[in-house]
Amino acid sequence: MPRIEKKFIACKDAAHATVGKFYEFKNATETSVDLYFYGDIVSDWWGAWQEEDQYPEAIKNFLAEANGKDLNIYINSGGGSVFAGIAIYNMLKRYPGKKTVHVDALAGSIASVIAFADSEAPTIPSNAYLMIHKPWAGCEGNAIEMRKMADTLDAVEAGILSVYEEHLAEGVDIKTVKKLMEEETWLDGTKAAEYFQVKVGEENTVAAAVQDFTKMYCRNAPKDLVGAGTADNERLRQQDQEKRKSIIALTMAHMSQ
C-alpha cells in the first residue's frame, strides 16, 4: 500500500475518533437511558457536522451499549436522509427494551417516521409539531435516469406510508395521510391526534429545530418556528466551523507525519 494511502486511512480513523467525542450517552441509569434526536439525520459520521446530528452507525453503537435498557427517546429534528432515517427506525423497532417517545418540538420529514418507532403512541405537546411531506431528492441525468429517480421516490413514499398506516387514528384512511404528505402538512399535537395515534402533551418551551435546509425546502413551515430557529442556526453554524477546524487541523497533523 502506498505511504500516502496509509496516511489518509490513519487520518480518517483519527478524525472519526475526534468526531465520536462529540457523541455521548445522557442520563443513563441502571434501568434506562435517554436518546436524543436534536439535529439532522445523516448517513454517516462524516456528515455529522453538528454534535446533535445522528446517523445509523451511532445509533447501532448506542443501542448495543444500552443493552436492553428502557429507552426515553426525545425528538426535535427537521429530518434529513430518508434511508438513514429508515435504518434508524428499523433498528429502534427491533430493540428489545421498552421505548417511550417524546416529540419535544418538531418531528419533521423522516424524523416523523422515527417518532413512530415505538409500538405505543408518542407524546406530542400541543405546541409541538409533526411535519409530513413527500420525499424529495436531487437528481441529474437524462430522461431515463430522471424517471428511475421518480420511481425510487414513489417506492420510498410507499415505505413511509406503511409506517404511518400502522399508527392511524381510528377511522382515518391512509389516502387522507397521503394527501397531507402531498401538501406538506404541519400538525401540532392536537391536530396530529386527529390523524395518528399520539398522546397530546402539555405545552413546553423547547424551540423547534427549524434548520436552514428546512426553511429552504419546506414551503409551509409556521412563521413562529422559522423566526425561533434563527439563533439556533447561528449557534449550529459556529459549532460547524469549530468542528471543521478541528478535523482539518487533525488531518494536517497526520499528513505531516
Predicted regions, residues:
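N-terminal organellar transit peptides
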Residues: M1-H102, L106-I110, D118-Q257
